[in-house]
UniProtKB/Swiss-Prot annotation:
Gene designation: cia1
Source organism (scientific name): Aspergillus oryzae (strain ATCC 42149 / RIB 40) (Yellow koji mold)
Keyword Cytoplasm among record annotations: no
Spans of repeat WD: 15-57, 61-103, 140-179, 187-226, 254-297, 327-366, 396-438
Protein name as catalogued: Probable cytosolic iron-sulfur protein assembly protein 1
Record SUPFAM superfamilies: WD40 repeat-like
Length: 438
């Protein structure tokens, strides 16, 4: 465990009123200062991040606990929310609103008071404008739905279940709320816990009780598995992708931040965003795709290494990039990778919140030819990074397990420019909003 964290987490507010039953997950809206929280009481609660109060309660669509939800991206003039339930169904909810948007469609934030949104009107109007509409029920899974995720374009919705299957649905966007099943994947050998879309590509990652992570792509109108990882030794609970254009922080001892950043971006442009995972084995791991040139060169002799994602087809090879500092003492249920700062947070059964930061290191690297004599001409510069735990908070929700964590843009009147908050969701029904002080 890190001896001297350099930052601290401070409670900003609880979201009120809370659910009286277990809450599973909180999903920040992609553009508005609101969040949706899933609860065992069969409802989804929508809260404001400007005043931390309840705006709406979505109910009546599911017969059992609502386990997961996700906002559809790139929707104009309304909010669209997908919900997944233990009743084996997926609900699509819609609501017309202009809350938090200026006339030109840009996102704005409340400034004048806790009860005003960016257009200067009371946020309570958001609740009174119009009720949520239960648009359609997607029926196909045979057991509890554990995760839902929209593709970057918003046209595809992935769902996964305890029935070991992953479904991909296409929103036909025909004005009649019609969805079409485009794929059903059943390669996992256990409960599928999480699905997460690549931030820009139509590539889907899934995590399972079978201890594996799998990658899926469409090939000639047919979705199939392109890679499978067997690096974790326990259930893989959650996945999150790195943001586009992320660059690690520069360590204080490094005087070459600019050149390192440029070299880093060049390297990442070849492999793309990385993938973070967390597990029952109490580890957080980060995976990266090997560029095609490297895959061709190392195709022979790559067996026997447990941290390699071995392709079952011909498409991709993924490998472990790093094992993060092992801070948690029990199962890790969720990770959240900030798309703005590159910070990564984890939560789990031990009640801890841990925040990690990636820092540049500088060290020489030898050329691949090991027979080359040791001299200055045989040494080439290469970027290296290390992850450190910069903040550790014990007992974030008292004695209760923390089920989920998410980053969101801070929206209350005391915010700083581009400041983010952490939102945690727990077994006691509470949702807490935290600030990171450095």
């Amino acid at each position: 465990m890190t001896e001297n964290p350099t930052a601290s987490l401070t409670l900003l507010s609880d979201l009120t009123p809370p659910s009286l039953e277990r809450t599973w997950l909180t999903a920040p809206h992609p553009s508005l200062p609101i969040v949706a929280t899933c609860s065992s009481d069969k409802t989804v609660r929508v809260y404001s991040l400007t005043n931390f109060r309840l705006l709406s309660t979505i109910s009546g669509g599911h017969k059992r606990s609502v386990r997961t939800c996700a906002w559809k991206p790139h929707v104009q003039g309304e909010s669209v929310l997908a919900t997944g339930s233990f009743d084996a169904t997926v609900g699509i909810w819609r609501r017309w609103d202009s809350y938090g948007r200026a006339e030109d469609g840009t996102d704005v934030r409340g400034l004048s008071s806790e009860t005003l949104d960016g257009n200067g009107r009371d946020t309570q109007e958001y609740e009174d404008d119009e009720e949520w509409r239960f648009a359609v029920l997607l029926d196909g899974h045979d057991s509890e739905v554990k995760s839902v995720s929209w593709s970057p374009s918003g046209m595809l919705l992935a769902t996964c279940s305890r029935d070991k299957s992953i479904w991909i649905w296409e929103d036909l966007d025909d004005g009649d709320n019609n969805f079409e099943t485009v794929a059903v994947m059943q390669e996992h050998e256990g409960d599928v816990k999480c699905v997460a879309w690549h931030p820009v590509e139509e590539c889907l990652a899934s995590a399972s009780y079978d201890n594996t992570i799998r990658l899926w792509r469409e090939d000639i109108d047919d979705w199939g598995q392109v890679a499978c990882i067997k690096g974790h030794t326990g259930t893989v609970w959650y996945l999150d992708w790195e943001g586009i254009g992320n660059v690690p922080s520069t360590a204080a001892v490094c005087e070459q931040g600019t050149s390192l950043s440029a070299e880093w971006k060049d390297q990442r442009a070849m492999s793309g965003p990385r993938l973070a995972s967390c597990s029952d084995d109490r580890t957080v791991r980060i995976w990266k795709r090997r560029p095609k040139e490297q895959r061709a060169q190392s195709q022979v002799g790559s067996t026997g290494i447990p941290s390699i994602i071995r392709p079952t087809g011909t498409d991709e090879t993924w490998e472990e990039d790093v094992l993060l500092p092992q801070i948690h003492e029990l199962s890790i249920y969720a990770v959240a990778w900030s798309k703005r700062t590159g910070l990564l947070a984890s939560v789990g059964a031990d009640g801890r919140i841990v925040v990690y930061e990636e820092l540049f290191l500088t060290s020489p690297a030898r050329t691949p030819d090991t027979n080359t004599p040791t001299d200055t001409s045989a040494i080439i510069p290469r970027t290296h990074t290390e992850w450190v735990a910069i903040a550790i908070l014990e007992g974030a929700h008292g004695i209760y397990e923390v089920n989920h964590v998410a980053w969101a843009r801070r929206a209350d009147r005391c915010r700083k420019e581009n400041e983010e908050v952490l939102i945690t969701t727990a077994d006691d029904g509470s949702i807490k909003v935290w600030t990171l002080r450095r």
